[in-house]
Structure formats: C-alpha cells, structure tokens
Amino acid sequence: MTDTATDMVPLLEVKGLGVEFQTRGGTAHVLEDIQLHIQRGETLGLVGESGCGKSITALALMRLIPQPPGRITSGQILFDGQDLLQLPEAQMRRVRGNRISMIFQEPMTSLNPAYSVGDQITESVRLHQGLNAKDGLARAVEMLEAVGIPDALRRVHEYPHQFSGGMRQRVMIAMALACQPDILIADEPTTALDVTVQAQIFDLIRDLRERSGTAVLLITHDMGAVAEMTNRVAVMYAGRMVEEGPTDVVLSNPCHPYTQGLIACAPGRSPQSHGQPLQEIPGTVPSLLERQGGCTFADRCSQAQPRCRTTVPPSTWVQSGHRVMCWLYPEGNQHA
C-alpha cells in the first residue's frame, strides 16, 4: 500500500454506533447510528448542547459504558483496522490508556487524592510499557515538564490537593499522553477553568499534537474553541449526528437548521449578531425515552416538512467532505 493510500485510511472509524440505557422510565436511546472518522494527526471537534451524547460517544470509544445500566447495541469502532467492540477485555486494556487516552471532564475530581501525581502518571507507563519504578518516575517528571509544570522533580511527589485547577488539568493531560497514544480524547478539557487557563490548556493540547502527531477528538460546546482548534467538526443533536465537515466550511456555511441555530446562539459568531439580542432555539430537546420516526429536531425546526416527522433523513453529501442529515438537501449524493 502506498503512503498516500495509507493516509486516506482513517485511524479511527465509527460505523452505526448505538447505545442505550435502562432507566426506571424505560429504555433511553442515547446514541443512534453514529458515524464519524478521525485521520492520523488531525483534530476533530464534537459539538452539541449538554445531553446530546458527546461524552457517551467518548466512553463508548473507550468501551467504558457502565453495564448495566448501559450497553452498546450496534455498530463498529474500527481502530487501526481492528473492531474494538470485538476485542476481549484483556486485549482492550492494552488499547485503553495506551493507544487511546482520555482527558476526563472534571480535573478537580478526576485525580485520586490518596496518591501522588507521580504515582498516578507512572501507573499507566509501568502497566503498558513495562517500565520499572525508577524509569516510570523519570517518565512522570518528563511529562510534567512537557505540560509546563515548573519544578517537576519536586512536584511529582505532591498530591492533587496541592495543585490548582489549571495545574490539575495539566496533570491529567500528562497522564493521558504518558504512553504516547495515537488518539487523545479531550472531553470538555477546560470545564470550570478561568478564561486565561482555558487558553493555556488549548495551546498546550495544540502544541503537543503538533509535536507528537497524536490525533485529537475535542468534545466541547464552545464554538470558539472549535474554530481555533479543529480541522473538522461533527455536530450532534439528541443522540444523532446531524452534520459533519471541515471546520471552516461548517462554521461559515452551516447546512442543518440545528447547526445554524447553534452558531447563531454563540455571541459574536454570526456577523449579523453584533449589537443584536442573543438568539435562542425555541422548544426543548425531545425525550430519549420517547423515540419516534423522523428527524429529532423536527419539532423545533422552522423549516420542517411533513416527512421530517415520519422518516429519518439520510446522510447527504452537500460537497466534498461535508455531509448533513436533513431533508432540505437533494438525495442524489447519499452516503451508502
């Protein structure tokens, strides 16, 4: 296979992923027919409002869906040509935290208060790379220095409560990158951090990606972060993917009515928004317990047609690399 052909094969490809949870009220269809891919060395943004399924998608990729009450009901997660859903758990543990790592959403609570940050960083490299205690500690110091923590040789022995929120997030990034993963999943990596620290964390992720070639899945609701950090963006609504494409194309020419509304709601994202009242998307997100046929956004969409409420729209390519699930677009370029 040529280098060009190899570059065209996605590092990660998700096909038809479905996830459901059993609740007291019934079955919640949390993810339905999720399709996405990530190329080597690129950053894909995954956006949508709270509860749309972004974090569940990340947990599914890591095979960390709690069972019960949740379960993966359908689909494939192809990583480097291998379906992760078919791997025995022992083999999946060799991938998780090693070749695919994750920065979890809450830096203030994601670290174990009973162990030093050095112990928590060295755990993964000793497990996956077979380093002894001395070499593992040296790697921990190296990673703390790489993420910009000063006096790393001393601080590697300190505990999470001795670090600020921004520094804890840097520790989380150091842990995630310690094994030099192929993919880094960053789930709202700047949650609860002030604006200055947010910018530092994004700069750090971008710099580490450029130096190591790691692909990044950036989960966020911040359209500014998407514009600054990502090559492509995928938009989710109520457990379904509604639009995907190059970031500059989607932000400048959004096709799905939900994407249009999401961008219009972001202060300053739309040129027409300056000096105008903030816009909102009318209505509420549909219950995941009451799935019906059709587009999940139909009841909130000003452009809805009768078939929008009865038939799920196909995935249609509106131009190269840009697809949308909406009946407003011709059906001639449907994705097989």
Regions found by a protein language model. Give the residues of each.
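Conserved ABC transporter NBD signature motif
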Residues: 72-83
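P-loop NTP-binding/switch modules centered on Walker-like glycine-rich loops
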Residues: 49, 185-189, 193-276
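Conserved ABC ATPase "signature" region
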Residues: 82-83, 135-154, 263-264
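Short catalytic/signature loops enriched in Gly
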Residues: 7-10, 27, 150-154, 244-336
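ABC ATPase NBD coupling module
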Residues: 84-101, 119, 127, 249-254, ...
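A short, proline-enriched helix->beta-strand linker immediately N-terminal to the Walker B motif
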Residues: 178-182
